UniProtKB/Swiss-Prot annotation:
Major place of residence: membrane
Its EC number(s): 7.3.2.2
Binding sites annotated in the UniProt record for ATP: G41, L42, S43, G44, S45, G46, K47, S48
Quaternary structure note: The complex is composed of two ATP-binding proteins (PhnC), two transmembrane proteins (PhnE) and a solute-binding protein (PhnD).
Cellular compartments annotated: Cell inner membrane
Catalytic activity: phosphonate(out) + ATP + H2O = phosphonate(in) + ADP + phosphate + H(+)
Gene behind this protein: phnC
Protein name as annotated: Phosphonates import ATP-binding protein PhnC
Enzyme class label: translocase
Classification via NCBIfam families: ABC_phnC (TIGR02315)
GO annotations of cellular component type: plasma membrane
Domain ABC transporter: 8-253
Membrane-related topology note: Peripheral membrane protein
Family named by the database record: Belongs to the ABC transporter superfamily. Phosphonates importer (TC 3.A.1.9.1) family.
Length: 261
């Protein structure tokens, strides 16, 4: 049983866009070291907005975010925000790779936050960093692709490159924003297996947005469900009953059987 102090604590977090849409409404959440927390909910429920507010890619309207005991939700200093992001890596649905650069160069980009402006502009990486990048590619099973251009890879391989790039930050928290929604069923499990391995073997806490409950039940240690920007469920994957499923996704929704994905 996890009894540690929270790695991440969110208090009364809200986000309202300029057009008046309230994407998040008074979110309160704790995430402990070593958890694999999955956030579920319909498209537009606030899942992506939540993750983007956590690492300040989007500015919260109100509320507090504490990361490793430090309040980061209201910080305005660019250098402090950069420091926070260096320990809070993120991967995205569409990979965000540089298509014409090599796989190895894309992975090395994960070290840019630790570089000076001058080093970043010139892409200066040490031999040790190159060795580390190759090791991270080995960890996600594509070391042999290091010299290929990123646009020569399949979708699943691109996401594994994105994971290897995230590991270059040496994060304590990995945010995964719908990491498998654009992948085929078999590849979904390959990517999710690597995320679980990173979580269990490297001790990196993971927060992932997912759609398919079969994946949630297989990989999550805990689940939070959002609906219209509010948390409507929090608990273990096995506690999502058929009644809860309908409350989260609507009366007409149908679950995806484990054999379907």
């Amino acid at each position: 049983m996890i009894v540690s102090e929270p790695l991440l604590r969110v208090e009364n977090l809200s986000k309202t866009y300029p057009n008046g849409v309230q994407a998040l409404k008074n979110i309160n959440l704790e995430v402990h070291p070593g958890e694999f927390l999955v956030v579920i909910g319909l498209s537009g429920s606030g899942k992506s907005t939540l993750l983007r507010c956590l690492n300040r890619l989007q500015e919260p309207t109100s509320g507090n975010i504490y990361f490793s005991g430090q309040e980061i939700g209201q910080v305005q200093d660019a250098e402090k925000i950069r420091s926070v992001r260096s320990k809070m890596a993120m991967i995205f649905q569409h990979f965000n790779l540089i298509p014409r650069q090599s796989v190895l160069k894309n992975v090395l980009m994960g070290r840019l936050a630790a570089k000076s402006t001058w080093q970043s502009l010139w892409g200066m990486f040490s031999d040790a960093e190159r060795i580390e990048a190759k090791e991270n590619l080995r960890l996600v099973g594509i070391a042999e692709k290091a010299s290929l251009r990123a646009d020569q890879l399949s979708g699943g391989q691109k996401q594994r490159v994105a994971i290897a790039r995230a590991l270059m930050q040496k994060p304590v928290l990995l945010l995964a924003d719908e990491p498998v929604s654009s992948l085929d069923p078999a590849t979904c499990h390959v990517v999710m297996d690597y995320l679980r391995r990173i979580n269990q073997e490297m001790g990196i806490t993971v927060i992932a947005n997912l759609h398919f409950l079969s994946l949630v039940r297989k990989y999550a240690t805990r689940v939070v469900a959002l609906k219209d920007g509010e948390i409507v469920f929090r608990g273990k994957p096995e506690e999502i009953t058929e009644e809860w499923f309908r409350r989260i996704y609507g009366e007409g929704a149908q679950d995806v059987a484990p054999n379907d994905i």
